[in-house]
Regions:
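C-terminal, surface-exposed recognition/capping segments
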Residues: 10, 14-152
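An acidic, glycine-rich, mixed-charge low-complexity segment common to nucleic-acid enzymes
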Residues: 2-4, 16
Length: 152
């Protein structure tokens, strides 16, 4: 179930104001294998120190993304967070995605569902997607295999 996942507005805040940082050296494991690569994001409480983070509306001019379709695509910084504030970030591994029975781009790309359906099509959902260069929020069809994971 996607009920406990962040909604479209929340993933927009992470993408837009979460200081997304690609870490190509962080090691993680899945399905009995070691992999590297993933994204660090500021946690919700840390974003709230400087921004008006809300579950009801997205950052800037986006409004409620569940009602007003919006796409975000943003360049990311490189390297893990360091120093005093590093503990205020969380890590999402680049778990790849499934499509037509195959696993794609594990260690290169992360694709995570939100709890929000697309505003014009209940067969679509909002998702957070990232790679070493960009982080994006968009909608896609529910026939692809993205990950269902609470963020923090």
């Amino acid at each position: 179930s996607c009920k406990k996942l962040p909604n479209a507005n929340e993933i927009a805040w992470y993408a837009e104001k979460g200081d997304a940082r690609w870490d190509g050296e962080r090691i993680w494991t899945t399905m009995g294998h070691l992999y590297k690569g993933g994204m660090w994001f500021k946690n919700k409480a840390f974003i709230k120190l400087t921004e008006s983070f809300s579950e009801s509306y997205g950052p800037g001019f986006y409004g409620d993304m569940r009602d007003n379709w919006g796409m975000i695509s943003k360049s990311v910084a490189q390297g893990a967070p360091v120093g005093f504030f590093a503990e205020r970030y969380f890590f999402l591994p680049a778990l790849g995605s499934y499509s037509v029975g195959y696993l794609y781009k594990i260690g290169e790309e992360g694709c995570y569902w939100s709890s929000s359906a697309g505003n014009n099509n209940s067969n679509c959902g909002y998702m957070l997607e990232f790679n070493k260069n960009t982080v994006s929020v968009n909608t896609t069809g529910s026939d692809v295999g993205y990950y269902v994971m609470e963020f923090e």
